[in-house]
Regions:
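Juxta-kinase regulatory segment immediately upstream of eukaryotic protein kinase catalytic domains
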Residues: 1-28
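ATP/Mg2+ or Mg2+-diphosphate-binding catalytic cores
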Residues: 2-5, 287-320
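ATP-binding pocket architecture of kinase catalytic cores
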Residues: 30-175, 179-182
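A short helix-loop-beta-strand connector motif used in the catalytic cores of GNAT acetyltransferases and
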Residues: 38-40, 204-209
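Conserved catalytic motifs of the protein kinase core domain
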Residues: 47, 103, 208-209, 230
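Extended, well-ordered alpha-helical scaffold segments
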Residues: 131-134, 186-199, 299-311
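Active-site Asp-x-Gly
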Residues: 165-166, 178, 209-212, 217-219, ...
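Hydrophobic alpha-helical segments that form the core
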Residues: 276-289
Length: 320
């Protein structure tokens, strides 16, 4: 946690920052809920909108991997800036000082269309299925982007990557395990570390680093064309890294329509099944730890603990 916790940005200060960045005097501000980092929608007279993000309140407990998301998103947008078929939004401003808003902030855009969470209640089951299929197609295109090494995208700016997916995955899992240990959550920590070590060979079968968005599928993150029922982009690329695309949360419990859009899902051979259970282990562990750090009433922890138990049982039975 930063030594000087960010204060809540003043709306007038946000408006001035938006006007300067977008070179427009007509910028309306709307604070959005449902996001870890504080988000404001900046709307101009041109019909597009932009997103301004600042750090969470100092009362919000962050996990290790949730720090530095503004810088991570800026890097992701730069990496994807040559792919207009994937990302129409661009990095407008990254200000890592606290002088202007009392917190570092990022502005990205322009975004066309609607945030899926805003329009979902008004859509028919057929429209929702079309959007799920379109999301699968979008993720397939994202997954085609190759990187130089496994690990953070920021390795292109001097951060060392790894040539081992097994090592990278173990490092990512270890970060969440330590968050759980710090909070004294009752979990089988050493058993989880052990199953990752025992299934290292299955992870090492992944040799080509590809673009992964770890946290992709939330309705608040997906931008859609509500008339044509298709996905046009994402609101947040901060969880991007180079790894195995099947680790993304959109493969945690995919719908049939998503699977139709993406194509073949990884449930064929033994190594694929082992990797998928390892990824279920990661996401269910993350859900349990996150619930402890930031309690909610959505019942996520109980289901996540069941998934965690199932993954551990399958991985223990399938050990080599």
């Amino acid at each position: 946690m930063p030594s000087n916790p960010p204060r809540s940005p003043d709306v007038s200060a946000i408006q001035r920052a938006g006007q300067d960045a977008l070179q427009s005097k007509n910028v309306s501000i709307e604070k959005l809920s449902g996001y870890l980092y504080r988000n404001c929608r900046l709307t101009t007279s041109k019909g597009f909108f932009y997103i301004l993000k600042t750090r969470p309140s100092h009362n919000c407990r962050l996990l290790r991997h949730e720090e530095g998301r503004l810088e991570a998103e800026a890097c992701a947008l730069q990496v994807l800036s040559t792919r207009p078929d994937l990302v129409s939004a661009r990095l407008i401003v990254l200000d890592t000082t606290t002088l202007r808003l009392g917190s570092s902030y990022l502005i990205s855009g322009p975004f066309g269309g609607s945030i899926f969470a805003d329009v979902e209640p008004s859509l028919s089951p057929q429209a929702l299925a079309s959007i799920d299929k379109s999301l699968g197609q979008y993720v397939r295109r994202l997954s085609s982007v190759a990187g130089p090494a496994f690990g953070p995208l920021r390795q292109v700016q001097g951060y060392p990557g790894s040539q081992s997916w097994a090592r990278t995955f173990a490092t990512m899992l270890e970060s969440v395990l330590r968050d759980g240990e710090d909070a004294l959550i009752n979990l089988p920590y050493e058993a989880m570390r052990d199953v990752v070590r025992r299934h290292r060979a299955s992870l090492e079968k992944i040799t080509q680093p590809k673009l992964v968005l770890l946290e992709l599928s939330a309705d608040e993150n997906v931008i859609v064309d509500a008339k044509n029922h298709r996905v046009t982009g994402l609101l947040d690329y901060a969880s991007a890294f180079w790894g195995d695309p099947f680790m993304s949360d959109c493969f945690y419990k995919p719908t049939a329509s998503f699977a139709e859009g993406f194509g073949k899902l990884p449930n064929g051979d033994t190594d694929e099944r082992i990797r998928q259970y390892l990824y279920v282990l990661y996401h269910s562990l993350l859900a349990v730890v996150r619930q402890c750090y930031r309690p909610s009433e959505d019942g996520e922890e109980l289901e996540a603990r069941r998934d965690l138990t199932t993954a551990m049982r399958q991985l223990s039975a399938g050990s080599r």
